[in-house]
């Protein structure tokens, strides 16, 4: 009997240790790997842009008097390639050091390396809905502080030639994973009623679950050439 009790106890200890190791892997190691992967993607983009290996997406235009920033006419970029980074996102509300790469596609392999652009939604700066997903927890926790986002917050992206500043209009809005209308070209639940240049960000809810989704919607507020310097939203 003692042998049986000892064996069961040892098995319980072993299983408990394995669970602890698994939790440590999920909480720590996936984050370390994801942070490294995201930094690598950003470094690669900066190298490409410094070498001029990016197709220009905009040409200088008039000055936006209210914002004091240059408005540019945005041309359609080349098609995005699955799993490849094409832009960097900045959200000052989440910290002035917060920056994440945006890659094409929403596969698990893509989400492990950064934010994921929903294939089939609008390209950056184009008419329609530029929709992006990101993990709330694990894999670097890119959208851990998603609930802090508020209307009026800036979401800034660059593709190496142009800065795009979006302004949040609504959210965070809670819904279910099957509610795919949130990334429609004109997402009605956002309050938008006509075509425009929109941005949708999505992540999981609750923080450690995935039974629901949190959504924010934004509109394109301004654009400017990278030669003009950082947009006002990124200036401290």
Residue ranges and their predicted role:
Residues 126-130, 136-236:
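Extracytoplasmic/periplasmic soluble domains downstream of a signal peptide or transmembrane helix
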Residues 33-81, 193, 227-236:
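N-terminal low-complexity, Pro/Thr-rich disordered segments
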Residues 1-47:
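N-terminal membrane-targeting segments
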Residues 119-127:
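A glycine-rich, hydrophobic loop/mini-helix early in the fold
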Residues 23-26, 85-101, 150-167, 203:
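Beta-strand cores of secreted/periplasmic/IMS beta-sandwich domains, seen most often
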Residues 70-119:
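Extended boundary segments
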